[in-house]
Amino acid sequence: MLFKNQLAYSITFIALCMASMGGALIAQTKVWSEDMTTSLAEVGWIEQANDGFIIAAGAKGLMGLDNNTGKQVWIKPELKGVIQASYQNIEGLPLFYAEYTPIVGKTRGIIIHSSTGDILYDTKDDNYRIKTYHLLPDQGVILFEMTKENTKLLMSFSLSTMSKTWVTDLGVIKGLIAQLGNSTTRESFIDHGPMFSKSGDLIVGMKEMAYGIDAKTGTINWRYEADKDLQALVYSPQNNSLYLGVKKSNKLTVLEPAKGTDITPGKLKLKGVLLDITSDSKNNIVLVESEGFNLIDPKTNDLIWNKSYKIPYLDEVIPFQKGYIAVAKDADNGSIAYVDNTGKQIWDTKVKGYVYYATTTEKGVLYISTERSNIISFSDGKDIWDKDVKFKSVPAVTYDDVEKKVIMFESKTGYKFDLATGDMNIFAEDIKLEDVTWKTPLEAECRPKGYFFYTNQHTSLVDKKGKLVYTKEYPQLSSTDLTSLAQLGANIAGVDVDVAGSIENMKELDRLSKGAYTTSNAASQGTAKTDVMASAAITNTNLSFEVTRTRYSNSRIARDHMFITTKDETSKRSILMINKDTGKADKTINIVDTTPLYVVDEIDTRVFICEHNMTIICYDMK
């Protein structure tokens, strides 16, 4: 889990200002204005916590301000020099992590209760750096990943006591990340897990290592080191066994999770090299190797099928209710096969191009390759769509609740896809969106008047009949190449082909194909997540969960506007509140500073600006 995606509701933090677009705009309301000269001397940066409070760092310390009144709630004079790049809200909780460098001593990391300013954890002189975290509400803990120079550590933080339970050392970091041990990088070093055995032990895997850890004390009960990085680490509660495998290895290992004892049965041997291990809804272990795939009965560790199912270039197996979909990935000889629950082939269909995305739908297998896209029918293995759809990149995806169809847009063309019937219709053609190419990581949202397509700097609306209502690209100050960032995400997700677009669209396709017809965005998930975290910390009465719950509830309301920062031809900077249905800037805030500090709160529709590093102003944009 990456820290930059950890908010369960949609707040956009903005570090630069941009310019006003001309036109007559409705004036915004100034809610409050606070001079920070006396309290902080000079404001270095501002952020917003999950409870809505504004966190301001200055020469005289770190302060929490009530976002509704601007009044100081707490101040920590000892926290001078807090590093903004290290600031990270902890999802669903009124907690945040930050680092600061005291006048004397090493850089410290702190976890703060944003509503009270209480320091719940301080690394002090231990020189720890928190990288990322895992919320584990069933266990009532937050598991923090930390580093100390070139050493990996885990910390268990109790939600009931709001304090550290234990810290355990996992050993020296190997490879490139060793150079980043004490930097502010937020990437997780856990590749598999965290997961828990029947006895409650914590199991994690990273690179070539697997660990069994006492979840109560942090004691490492056992560690296992493979020859190469682990491809899979799967725990089966049915037989209380842990399955480990290294990619392209001819060995599968089974461990007893309490002591890490090797209990691999002699009869469980690979015929080829390991590609993957996963599980299905029937609690079987799915073993995928170069010589085919088979099922392991977790009760006996025997192979269930007499003969493994094999196709050339096998790379992925997708379990589903009716059986298994085997995907062979090759640019020239790819194929997709349907295998029933007994291991019998129902059909095997050749596919043009390298398949970088496949999922099951009600009618068949939806796939996207570098050459074409279609649905292969479960009934006969033939294409459902009369004509192939060729996507140059991952399409923008949303769902129309009224028409009950998936909406996809890519390369000037809009498609309506009925998951129930498998029908695909083109509803928009030759739609030219301003400065949008096939590499643009475009995302989509269904609106009452049509389909809204956007990036951080782009807005467009196409009505439901396929007519372009408006399209606009807004200049940005930063030269960051967002398409290259999107491609990096694709590579991380295992897509080793020349494909651009937003990885969020691939996730959305997965959700929709599995029946999640309501867009599963951060805003709609917020309240449920907060309630889960609140129940996990029910014994602690000072966590302001009612505040965070209210803000999450607000975030569920459909947002009619999008905030964009931009500049005009004269380099005049502004924050614009763009109406998604009209494309017009309903409100704007002009910025006076060359490098201003501000936060856009999309939940309460407010903008907080710090002018001249002295005065924080709150504007209501409703």
Please report, for each region that a protein language model flagged, where it lies by residue.
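Absolute N-terminal positional cue centered near the fourth residue
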Residues: 4-5, 21-24
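Bacterial N-terminal signal peptides that target proteins for export
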Residues: 1-12
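Secretory-pathway ectodomains
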Residues: 23-622
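Bacterial N-terminal signal peptides
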Residues: 10-22
